[in-house]
Amino acid sequence: MEKMKATRNNMKYSVVMSVYAKDNPEWLKQAIDSLLNQTIQPDEIVIVEDGPLTLQLNVVMSQYKNSGIISIVRLKRNQGLGNALNIGIKYAKNELIGRMDSDDIAIPNRFQLQLAEFEKHSDLDILGGQIAEFVDDPEEIIGYRKVPVTHFEIKQFARRRSPFNHPTVMYKKSMIQQIGGYDASIIRLEDYDLWLRAIAKGAVCANLDDVILKYRSTTDAVKRRKTFISLRNHIRARIQFYKKGYISLSDLTYGLATQIILFMIPTKLAKFAFKKAVRE
């Protein structure tokens, strides 16, 4: 108990979340409530409204106007996740920033676990964790997305796949800004690009072995991966990674072949293949 109090007093943190017009109002409320119900509550929650919201989303947002810790940044037009997160990071007042998506649910002690790790390892720059997937009912878990735990394992894993579950990460603001933040031109893989650049610059990385977030799995997410635009974005991004020296030619070939196969096979089979890949 004493250790928890020390962490609460000495390590304040912000949470950055982006919301846009196509988000589900009920899911957004669940996401925000999961932040407010943390065993160690954030010092502030920065929510970037990425363009005008629907009436229903505005109703949800209005419920938290007197929370005392939620700061809202409104963008006149939709700028995409990368830009929205960069703006949120800029507005965040604390060095430690937790990421959160507008449709997921943070485990109650998520940030208590992450803060304890940052307190234990002062050189740590990026810390993620494991996620449990659900469809409709957060209590009915359909699977887990496992990522490597140690810095060495993360570096090896990152050559072919993103080594972090993006909505679970907590990172140092100074480090993220030092490497230029998210590259908004890397559509869909802006987080993967960020991790590769951070690792290349010597960032110290780790993942907790604990499940710290419940991730909402939808068929729409798989369908978006199977569009020609998504395939084109993945190909462009991976070629850039190769040109910058982040991945080898064999890593590039593996990544391109995987994306092309997922694009060509039926959606149900693609969903099965994707889930099998991220859970192994």
Model-derived segments and their meaning:
Residues 220-280:
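Non-catalytic, C-terminal membrane-associated alpha-helical segments of glycosyltransferases
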Residues 2-227:
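Nucleotide-sugar donor-binding/catalytic module of glycosyltransferases
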